């Protein structure tokens, strides 16, 4: 039996193939994963509305890899979603790079995005693109 926090076999396999600088998208339930994740390995985790959350998945991912950068989709109206503060807290105060909606979509379609995970997250703008750091 596995004893770590991350036990999903497809996510573990995809992360094992990642190297420094590769990226992982953790998407909310509203994100158009099929059309806006390029050639990334896709994993659909949404079980029910709200489960799992993006922060649940981030916590599991952090138990397996180091994260050196985080990018978020910034609302056009200039508001800051509450979840951005949660991301920063979970990432040790790391500054979030804010991208406009279409800029974020473009970033998620780049070849370096190796894994895209869809969640049941209901909060809007709860999408997170993380860059894997060194071990």
Task: Annotate each language-model stretch with its function.
Residues 1-40, 44-47:
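Long, hydrophobic N-terminal alpha-helical segment
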Residues 19-22, 39-40, 67, 111-113, ...:
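Short coil/turn connectors at secondary-structure junctions
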Residues 36-69:
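A phosphate-binding glycine/aspartate-rich beta-alpha loop in the early core of alpha/beta enzymes
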Residues 74, 79-135:
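Glycine-rich, aromatic-bearing surface loops/beta-hairpins
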């Amino acid at each position: 039996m596995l004893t770590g926090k991350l036990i999903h076999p497809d996510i573990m396999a995809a992360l094992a193939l990642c190297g420094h600088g590769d990226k992982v998208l953790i998407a909310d339930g509203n994100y158009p994963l099929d059309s806006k994740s390029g050639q990334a390995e896709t994993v659909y985790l949404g079980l029910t509305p709200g489960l799992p959350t993006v922060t649940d998945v981030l916590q599991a991912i952090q138990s397996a890899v180091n994260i050196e950068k985080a990018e978020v989709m910034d609302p056009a109206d200039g508001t800051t979603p509450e979840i951005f503060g949660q991301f920063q807290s979970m990432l040790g105060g790391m500054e979030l790079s804010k991208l406009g909606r279409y800029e974020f979509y473009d970033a998620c379609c780049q070849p370096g995005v190796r894994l895209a995970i869809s969640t049941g997250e209901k909060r809007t703008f709860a999408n997170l693109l993380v860059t894997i750091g060194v071990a």
